[in-house]
Amino acid sequence: MGRRKKMVERVTTLMNDPQRIRNIGIVAHIDHGKTTLSDNLLAGAGMISKELAGKQLFMDSDEEEQARGITIDSSNVSMVHTFDNEDYLINLIDTPGHVDFGGDVTRAMRAVDGAVVVVDAVEGTMPQTETVLRQALREHVRPVLFVNKVDRLINELQVDSQEMQIRLGKVIDHVNKLIKNMNPEKFKAGWKVDAAAGTVAFGSALYNWAISVPMMKKTGVSFKDVYDYCKAGDMKSLAEKCPLHEAVLDMVIHFLPNPIEAQKGRVKVIWHGDENTEIGKAMTHANAEGDLAFMVTDISVDPHAGEVATGRLFSGSLTRGMEVFTSGSARKSRVQQVGIFMGPERLEVDKIPAGNIAAVTGLKEAIVGSTVTTLDGMTPFESIRHVSEPVVTVAVEAKHTKDLPKLIEVLRQVAKEDPTLQITLDEETGEHLMAGMGELHLEVIAHRIERDKNVEITTSKPIVVYRETIKKKTEPIEGKSPNRHNRFYIYAEPLDTEIVSAIKEGEVSMNLPELERRQKLIDLGMEKEEAKGIVGIFNSNIFIDMTKGIQYLNETMELVLDGFEEVMRAGPLTREPVANVKCVLVDAKLHEDAIHRGPAQIIPAARQAIQAGMLMAEDSLLEPYQKVFVQVPQLLMGGATKELQGRRGIILNMTTEGDLAIIEARVPVAEMFGFAGEIRSATEGRAMWSTEFGGFDVVPSSILNDIVGQIRERKGLKKELPKASDFLSM
């Protein structure tokens, strides 16, 4: 207990000195060794025993994670490392590498200032490496590089000392190429990774050794020595001379920014308020005496303490009993406990100052992305944007009817813990639908519901999530209210792809100041009058009011937008969500008496005009795609390409590396079910493959009617396809 008590004391002392804090994430492609690295860093810092490190998977504290051997959630831990005779506090988050859990990476990146990017020396940079690096740079998180599994390069691939250095150089060049393409300004500002400068370390997380140029100078161990030790299989001596935690954590402390340095540049990226206000200045300087500004990046459930909100404290200090506001809620909450993480355990402390990662209970209203503050009316932080969208759905039912109320509560909880999961109730069938990033994501959530929440459930076969869209512009369509006293004239047309991208990237939203939003849209090619008339943005669809001087329209616009949102949630063709549509209101006739233009009149009138307009504009479907990357011996390449093309896949690129072929393809998600088994048999089990979200594309007309028919049948809709007149005669 003595050692642990001492550790807690060191952590709580250092919390108060932002110069000596580093908030970092560890990111990588699946199986490149993040969690093993995290565990050995903890062992080096005296948090877990050295013998267990790497096997204990301390950070994978969830049974599901240990059974599957992958990290599913992000884990937090605080530890102390001594560098140049000074103690430093390192708050570390280990993130998942599997594409289905990319949402966790996005959220973790909001909490940290620096990232250790782990790349397997044998496999090199992989698709998920690119994705996590892009997420880090988008959040202005500075990267350093750790090239892992160097021993495999020497012992499995039998490369000589010179070839080893060439291959490691290639990995560094590729990572720099990615940084340069994704963020040229940061690259110019010195964010590239450079072995000579010390921002790259090489080693083996499993065997607990690592080397970097500063480390070589310190220990006198050269690349040649590393090669000889690995060849001789003497990893133990190497680990004694060049301990992993020393090389990596020294690099982190020396090159990654402390909260004060980081927040100077990061605050303006993640917060769009006025930097010259008191709260703006407090956040830019990580001022512990300022108003509280805390961003929630994760919510978990503790069986004893209830909901625990973890996040980054940008200004002010968190103390027990303080009253706070949560964005999106008018009610105040009272903070019950504040604490920090030590692996999966939460340690209570009295006070946590700005610049730290904190865990708080008592914030009933908070969800992931919430801004928690003591300042009423504070501009909230930018919402956290996820790189992928949910593309696969399953229907969930309780096995025993008595569990239904519990299931509803559990689904609400699960959706709160994992914002990349979408839970909806199908009003017509009464089923609960769970949409996620992929098959594995939904499997894990289903297991978790049964295991942690003790509710037995049955799930349907996975169903693909489609989007409805349109192909051409229509004339204005008249929508009449049921009492015939109100009329709206609305036309629909496809929204430009540049504008759709800007909405998805968060560059255009209703939260932006109006003039800034207008200018952005004009720059993207929208006409000035249209940009001025935008009154609603929902998902990737917009509603524009081009009318002039219509009486009572102001007070009914909210209801018109309700009608618009209803259609965008469930389009007329298949009741699937709508994407990339622009609806324009050109005229309206409204009854002068407010009683005759209530919700029951206005919403249906707007809804019908938009539904009919979409059907006249050639309503069509978009289907989700996945990019698939397959590594396979060249001799078996034919089997792999045949398997991909047989699934309506398009081969985008083929390259060779040694005797391996690397195939990059784009395949519809609908065709990807059962792919794992089939690709194994097509390549004698020798293919390595991974996927990432590949966007949406129009369903080929040859199969459109079949798919529409299947969706309508599944949802219990009429077999015959709807016509515009069905909506206008209502």
UniProtKB/Swiss-Prot annotation:
One Gene Ontology term, aspect cellular component: ribonucleoprotein complex
Pfam families the record matches: EFG_C, EFG_III, EFG_IV, GTP_EFTU, GTP_EFTU_D2
Residues engaged in binding GTP: 28-35, 94-98, 148-151
Molecular function GO terms recorded: GTP binding; GTPase activity; translation elongation factor activity
Keyword Electron transport carried by entry: no
InterPro entries the UniProt entry points to: EFG_II, EFG_III/V, EFG_V-like, EFTu-like_2, G_TR_CS, P-loop_NTPase, Ribosomal_Su5_D2-typ_SF, Ribsml_uS5_D2-typ_fold_subgr
UniProt entry tagged with the keyword GTP-binding: yes
UniProt domain tr-type G: residue ranges: 19-228
Keywords, sorted A to Z: Cytoplasm, Elongation factor, GTP-binding, Nucleotide-binding, Protein biosynthesis
Modification sites for Diphthamide: 596
Subcellular locations according to the entry: Cytoplasm
Main localization category: cytoplasm
SUPFAM superfamilies the record matches: EF-G C-terminal domain-like, P-loop containing nucleoside triphosphate hydrolases, Ribosomal protein S5 domain 2-like, Translation proteins
UniProt record, GO biological process: translational elongation
Function: Catalyzes the GTP-dependent ribosomal translocation step during translation elongation. During this step, the ribosome changes from the pre-translocational (PRE) to the post-translocational (POST) state as the newly formed A-site-bound peptidyl-tRNA and P-site-bound deacylated tRNA move to the P and E sites, respectively. Catalyzes the coordinated movement of the two tRNA molecules, the mRNA and conformational changes in the ribosome.
Similarity annotation: Belongs to the TRAFAC class translation factor GTPase superfamily. Classic translation factor GTPase family. EF-G/EF-2 subfamily.
Protein name: Elongation factor 2
Native species: Methanosarcina acetivorans (strain ATCC 35395 / DSM 2834 / JCM 12185 / C2A)
